[in-house]
């Protein structure tokens, strides 16, 4: 009798263990399905409006409080529509920017994006900025006819497309605000010396570039004050305690957010925007799309 009872107990224990394992498997599958649904259908549409304040002691008084709105990597196409862009533009204008900058990758797959080409510059033209709108090439803006279209689109929309050149903005006082832009480092022809030779020590110099890791080579270059970049998408997928799973070339050192860089002469700041759209796969997890409203200050608020 004792052996029979023990046998029945073991059977019940095995049955209970099997039931728990089945339930655990069901829970895991539900969580996986939920995570997939969230990362493909929800988070890609959860815009994060970040508001970094960069304090620069030597900032000209005329630039104290300057508001720069940066957006990047819209990748318009299957994963991001013109209607979504129009909604984004409303939020850009709500930020009442002094400057608006776009740091590349406007359309995801240019050859497939045919119906919206005429409308796109009309949408971008609605963006308002007191001191101007500026853009640089990204790798998706180059090749296959994209380069020519991107230039005409941005210029028709009122953006100044900067390709290895600088654009000075006269401000009250002796120091100017100078916006410079470099060509794409992956598919373009960046000419750094053409930009560096145009910069003056007395000015406040902002540099736009698509790939952020280019800035790692500029430690001895001066005078650079603020570098704005995109390209990384923040990895698109980030996991707790691990970080981004995959980042593109030239976005491995600087992935997202604000970095204070080493400089020989003055404080230098880099901000990497996570981008708006997605590429390859419409998925974001732990890396929400970002609209940056950046403010320059002489002293902390």
Annotate each language-model stretch with its function.
Residues 1-62:
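N-terminal membrane-anchoring alpha-helices
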Residues 53, 119-191, 197, 254, ...:
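Extended active-site neighborhood of metal-dependent phosphoesterases/phosphodiesterases
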Residues 56-69, 160, 167-180, 200-203, ...:
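Beta-strand-turn-beta hairpins that frame and shape the catalytic cleft
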Residues 62-160:
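Membrane-embedded segments
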Residues 76-79, 108-110, 139-147, 165-171, ...:
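Active-site environment of divalent metal-dependent phosphoester hydrolases
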Residues 95, 124-130, 197-201, 219-222:
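Short, conserved loop/helix-junction motifs that constitute active-site signature segments
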Residues 98-99, 134, 159-160, 177, ...:
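Short, Asp-centered acidic motifs that coordinate Mg2+ and/or phosphate
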Residues 212-295, 300-301:
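Conserved beta-sheet core of the metallophosphoesterase superfamily
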